[in-house]
């Protein structure tokens, strides 16, 4: 009958030597070479300490019903028309003030409690001699993130579009995107930018100047921008028809970069260290077995009797 190897187990051997012997020195050296180089390899291969990480979240966005509109007119009626939801701004406009009809609606498409888009429509009544060649529009939003970092801010969508031909309607369909110059910190409340984009209480014209508003906004490290590469300018307005701005602004899911917390960094570093360490442990185990079996360093070999056998002898 042919015999097969059905089971095997290693026999344990120990090697004895003094604590100050060459063998002890060799073991110390081997331990150092096993545990320290993986650390250096992990460290030198970059990304040992996780500095930035990212996650996805749909922000909670709310239109704040603040609007600032400047409509640039054709040369025959020189200048512009303006209107905003800020009484102080409107007072400054004199006879350039023209009150439009505004209707807005926020929609939650997937019924998850977060609004997904804003439908904004503005109809600016015009006299038959007035022609709109360009539009500057600011809408403000309250913008919140919850999942990793709690961010609360007031942000804006700035829309500017102009065309050489007088328009009847401007159609915009774009995303309100988050722009980060800096990763968010993990945990805690970030209300640094929970300040209004336009200071509506100020009586000074300077505070409503578009260059000033945009410049102050761009100083921020976290902003939102309206991203619509192709606003559509429709022409052919009837003499008594208003100029219409039709905007659909979507609130998409964002990839948010943040600074990981301490334990996340430690976990990431540990995983890298251990996966390299395993290779070193395996290699040095072979080296140690070779060195002791072949008596490269002098020791006294002892074969340890397996424990089970000892027990058995004791019992019988
Ligand atoms: C953010 O600002 C709004 C309006 O000023 C205020 O009602 C709200 O409490 C603020 N939120 C935080 C977290 O500071
Ligand atoms: C808004 O303007 C008023 C008047 O100039 C000023 O007192 C107030 O501090 C301003 N608020 C902010 C938030 O800048
Ligand atoms: C904005 O980011 C820069 C660079 O990361 C940083 O030095 C600065 O302190 C940040 N400003 C604020 C107000 O957090």
UniProtKB/Swiss-Prot annotation:
It comes from Homo sapiens. The keyword Cell membrane applies. It is linked to Joubert syndrome 20: A disorder presenting with cerebellar ataxia, oculomotor apraxia, hypotonia, neonatal breathing abnormalities and psychomotor delay. Neuroradiologically, it is characterized by cerebellar vermian hypoplasia/aplasia, thickened and reoriented superior cerebellar peduncles, and an abnormally large interpeduncular fossa, giving the appearance of a molar tooth on transaxial slices (molar tooth sign). Additional variable features include retinal dystrophy and renal disease. Meckel syndrome 11: A disorder characterized by a combination of renal cysts and variably associated features including developmental anomalies of the central nervous system (typically encephalocele), hepatic ductal dysplasia and cysts, and polydactyly. Glycans are attached at residues 194, 199, 221. The chain crosses the membrane at residues 23-43, 262-282. InterPro entries: TMEM231. This is Transmembrane protein 231. Belongs to the TMEM231 family. It is found in: Cell projection, Cilium membrane. Keywords: Cell membrane, Cell projection, Ciliopathy, Cilium, Cilium biogenesis/degradation, Disease variant, Glycoprotein, Joubert syndrome, Meckel syndrome, Membrane, Transmembrane, Transmembrane helix.
């Amino acid at each position: 009958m042919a015999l097969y190897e059905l089971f095997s187990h290693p026999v344990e051997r120990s090697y004895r030597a003094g604590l100050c012997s060459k063998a002890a020195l060799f073991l110390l050296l081997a331990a150092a070479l096993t545990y320290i180089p993986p650390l250096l390899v992990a460290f030198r291969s970059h990304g040992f300490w996780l500095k930035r990480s990212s996650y996805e979240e749909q922000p909670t966005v709310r239109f704040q019903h603040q609007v600032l509109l400047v409509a640039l007119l054709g040369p025959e009626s020189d200048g512009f028309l303006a209107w905003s939801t800020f009484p102080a701004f409107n007072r400054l406009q004199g006879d350039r003030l023209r009150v439009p009809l505004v209707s807005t609606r926020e929609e939650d498409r997937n019924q998850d409690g977060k609004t997904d888009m804003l439908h904004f429509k503005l109809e600016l009544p015009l006299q038959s001699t007035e022609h709109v060649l360009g539009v500057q529009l600011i809408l403000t939003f309250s913008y919140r993130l919850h999942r990793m970092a709690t961010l609360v801010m007031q942000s804006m969508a700035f829309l500017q579009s102009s065309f050489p031909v007088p328009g009847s309607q401007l159609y915009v369909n774009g995303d309100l995107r988050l722009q980060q110059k800096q990763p968010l910190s993990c945990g805690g409340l970030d209300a640094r930018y929970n300040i209004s984009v336009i200071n509506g209480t100020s009586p000074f014209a300077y505070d409503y100047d578009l260059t000033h508003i945009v410049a102050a906004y761009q100083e921020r490290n976290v902003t939102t921008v309206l991203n619509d590469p192709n606003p559509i300018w429709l022409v052919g307005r009837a003499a008594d028809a208003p100029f219409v701005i039709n905007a659909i602004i979507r609130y998409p899911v964002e990839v948010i970069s943040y600074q990981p917390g301490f334990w996340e960094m430690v976990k990431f570093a540990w995983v890298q260290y251990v996966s390299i360490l395993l290779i070193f442990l395996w290699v040095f185990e072979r080296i140690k077995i070779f060195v002791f079996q072949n008596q490269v360093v002098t020791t006294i070999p002892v074969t340890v009797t397996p424990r089970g056998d000892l027990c058995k002898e004791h019992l019988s």
